[in-house]
Amino acid sequence: MSVDLSSYRDQHFKGSRSEQERLLRLSTTLYVGNMSFYTTEEQIYELFSKCGDVKKVIMGLDRFHKTPCGFCFVEYYTREDAENAIRYVNGTKLDDRIIRTDWDAGFVEGRQFGRGKSGGQVRDEYRTDYDSGRGGYGKLMAQRVVPPPAVV
């Protein structure tokens, strides 16, 4: 039984909607999100290789600082192994964070960089909560120089 596609579509995809759908249905590449900024490539390999042979991991990087920014792409050799990862890894914890996986139409150079104005992920621009696993406050809140909450 194959794993269905989610409703999410990359708005920056270079091509038609039907081409994107076709690539998603054939893809062996996953987008992995909600990762800690401190999760390593080795941890990704260790977790995702439980579902099959991992061909490549591409860590998401801040566009300006070239530091991890909470996402990656995992490419498998087979669709079946990628489907197993979506079935069994999606929604599990890695570095105390519940990660999410989704199909990707295939990694293209340049997509490893965050798309937010500050260089990271867009979702981290507007976050108002303090999240130590994702660099503290969201970028807009951090500009207000708010001290982190006291650790009790």
Swiss-Prot record:
Family: Belongs to the RRM NCBP2 family.
Keyword RNA-binding tagged: yes
Domain of life of the native organism: Eukaryota
Subunit structure: Component of the nuclear cap-binding complex (CBC), a heterodimer composed of Cbp80 and Cbp20 that interacts with m7GpppG-capped RNA.
Record-listed mRNA binding positions: 8, 31, 100-104, 111-115, 121-122
Protein name: Nuclear cap-binding protein subunit 2
Domain called RRM: residue spans: 28-106
